[in-house]
Amino acid sequence: MATVTVSEISNQAAILRAELKEWERGFAAANGGKKAERGDIKKVPEIAAKYKEYSRLKSQESASSSKNDKSHSKPTDTQERSKKRKHSSPNGPEQSQSHCQTTSTPRKSAAGIFQTPSKLKTTHPADVDPYDSPSVLRRLFSPSTHMQTSSPLKTAIGPTPQRDGKALGLFDLLSESGGSTATPTAARMASLKGIAAQTPSKKRKMDTIREEDEEEEDSPRVERTPASSGKKYMLSALFATPTAWKYSSIVDDGTSRGVIGNNDVTKQSPQATRNIDHANANLETPSFLRRSTSGLTGPDPTDMSPLPVRKPQQFVGKGLSQLVQGLRDMEEERLEDEWDVLREIEIEQTGTGVDVPNSQAADPNSTGRTFKKKGQKRTTRLVKMRPVVQAKPTTTRSQPQSLSQSEPRFEHNLVSAGGSGDVDELGIDDNDLVAVAETQADGPPSGRVGIPAAFIDDDLDSLRSISEAEQDSDSDPDYDADSKPLGRSKSFSEKMKEAIGATGQGSDTKQAQERQKVKAKEKKEKENIDTNAKKPSTRKINPQAHANYRSLKIRNRGGGRNFGRFRRR
């Protein structure tokens, strides 16, 4: 009846477990792989009730299974149990014979009756929280989790192998002849078992198997084939970093004479030494490619002490900063010479240089350049060049004609009294006349009528002197600025025409025509002068310009005389 009850309980628990697992998978899929927690289970009352029922069934199943195990256990012979399981009880074989009746399933360890109770390693199902997931309960109640097995890491990872107090590397465990020292052979294990049966006089270490010489080898194992010279060379030179300890500890067999690893100096031949030097010379890095000359072993292979390390060769010449500074000094000297030449040329052009006599006599013995204190170089000063306004001349004066040119023309015109309408008797075109102000009264002079030709020469000389004086005279700018622009004075030809025309016939009509022409030209020139007068220029304002541009201090500019880089601080 009890067996049927246990099977029913296990079936119900399996059904509940399948339902709970299905719900857990659905919850994880809905929440992005998140597992159901205690709070999530409490939110669904049906699932919470199933969890409680599942924990109750599991506790009943465990209680009934323990009762069945106790009732169906049969007493066995103590001798047979001692043969099969020597240490079924934790206290040894003696106690296991006394309380063999209380032993449980082989999967579980038996508990001693007279043993001091200790804290249980597993929690009773009644004490387990009913909201724990089935995976937690399965881990708690599965017998495989309670079996006392050693951790795989403890067997895989052992202590660091050492020899003579020094840690061994991976390649140091390899023997020179190529045999493996880590995995023992069957023959060696048999020999070691025979040794272990004897009474040990001293505790032996089994961490590594030392290779023995042929004379000292008493074990019944078969001798190993000696490794070839190529294999020995590859192991010693390429696959392992040669250290001083390795050369001193490894003892090779008798076949390798004069090769690396043989510490016997007497057995080495000079030919072998030469071979070693040649091999090292081919393998070592060239001197020009080394970063630093490290300590090398001496020519004697038995000498374990390295040579003293050479210090790196120091740079004897100038450094880069000194070379750059020297180039800068040379450039400054060259610029100083150029500035001196420019200053001398400037002084010669302006003529402002004053020679000051030297108060100190020059030393005749001294050679080289005289010392000159270096001052401020390449000084830039702000110079505001304002435009200079010059008043334009208001009138254009005709060039004075010389007497040598005017007198022949005068004589020619006296002979030929007739002429065209545009060209007068003196041969002067109306286009050559410029509007000038009248300097003499209109009409012929009262005292000139009927003057003989003898007095005309004197009048010509006086007129020429007057006209030349007027041309040479300078105008007063203050007076000219206030007064109206005046026309030019009459030229020599005009004055001569007036003087001569007073005596000729029809002079009044000609003079009236000439006056009208002169007045018309004066009017035209006056209009031109008014239009060409300087008008006040309107100030153009850029609408995109900054309003406070003058108040900005841009690169220490525009701050006044004592505001630059070299101002007094």
UniProtKB/Swiss-Prot annotation:
UniProt biased composition (Basic residues): 370-384, 552-569
Localization terms from the record: Cytoplasm; Nucleus
One GO term of the biological process aspect: double-strand break repair via break-induced replication
Keyword Cytoplasm annotated: yes
InterPro entries registered for this protein in UniProt: DNA_rep_checkpnt_protein, Sld2
Sequence ranges of Polar residues compositional bias: 89-107, 142-153, 350-369, 392-407
CDD domains xrefs: RecQL4_SLD2_NTD
Ranges of Basic and acidic residues composition bias in the record: 67-81, 481-498, 511-533
Domain of life the protein comes from: Eukaryota
Family: Belongs to the SLD2 family.
Job of this protein: Has a role in the initiation of DNA replication. Required at S-phase checkpoint.
The protein's name in its UniProt record: DNA replication regulator sld2
Species, as recorded: Emericella nidulans (strain FGSC A4 / ATCC 38163 / CBS 112.46 / NRRL 194 / M139)
